[in-house]
Amino acid sequence: MVHYVKMEDGKVMPIQDMLKSIERYNPEHLKVIEAYVEEQARDNQYDLEANLACLKLYQFNPQLMNLDVTYVILLKALTNFPHTDFVLCKCLLLPAQMNDDTVKEIIYLADILEKCDFTLFWSRVAKNPPFFKKISGFFDSIRKFVCHVVGITFQSIEKQYLVRLLGDVDDNVLRAWVKKNNWKEDGQYITVAVQEGNIKTKHITEKIDFENLAPLMANCL
């Protein structure tokens, strides 16, 4: 669904166009941007530029800061690991946001994900599942990142270990992720794509001018 914002001259503009103009700094558009952030959470969409614009407006207008919207923005950034979206969002947080206990917990979760300590991540999430369920597709987005890490780290992995990394999923969910990543079950192990197949040779060409080579040739005479 396309969101529109109303300009001072009465004209309407798609929110994506507004974000490319100076109007992105107009606090009168904040409510529309916040509604767009909430829609992302409901419909499993993601628009980093809109979310950054929202945080920037909070910076310029601290009295308008909304913690609930802040939570959504940070959680959506988590779903886009391993990209650096979360770092960008964190850099725009106000002291009032940084001192909030829930924001601190989300930042801690980001740190855990960055360290790839997935079992600890899921144990923290399990303490308050409804909070994360507000973000449609949150769990699957994290599992996609888990599979990304597994795919570049292992040639084979014990099935039960993978189950734990994915958040203690059942057999059906496990098989779905194995199939999605073109892995294969082999008894108690999961065979991941052969690493040699992912290694690409790199050709390096260095140009050496004759002027640079002449002194060396002279020394060899």
From Swiss-Prot:
PROSITE patterns: PCI. It comes from the Eukaryota. Signal peptide: none annotated. Keywords: Cytoplasm, Initiation factor, Protein biosynthesis. It is found in: Cytoplasm. One of its GO terms (biological process) is regulation of translational initiation. GO terms for cellular component: eukaryotic 43S preinitiation complex; eukaryotic 48S preinitiation complex; eukaryotic translation initiation factor 3 complex. InterPro entries: ARM-type_fold (IPR016024), CSN8_PSD8_EIF3K (IPR033464), eIF3k (IPR009374), PCI_dom (IPR000717), Transl_init_fac_sub12_N_euk (IPR016020), WH-like_DNA-bd_sf (IPR036388), WH_DNA-bd_sf (IPR036390). Residues 46-207 form the PCI domain. PANTHER family: EUKARYOTIC TRANSLATION INITIATION FACTOR 3 SUBUNIT 11, EUKARYOTIC TRANSLATION INITIATION FACTOR 3 SUBUNIT K. Component of the eukaryotic translation initiation factor 3 (eIF-3) complex, which is involved in protein synthesis of a specialized repertoire of mRNAs and, together with other initiation factors, stimulates binding of mRNA and methionyl-tRNAi to the 40S ribosome. The eIF-3 complex specifically targets and initiates translation of a subset of mRNAs involved in cell proliferation. HAMAP family: eIF3k. Belongs to the eIF-3 subunit K family. This is Eukaryotic translation initiation factor 3 subunit K. It comes from Aedes aegypti (Yellowfever mosquito).
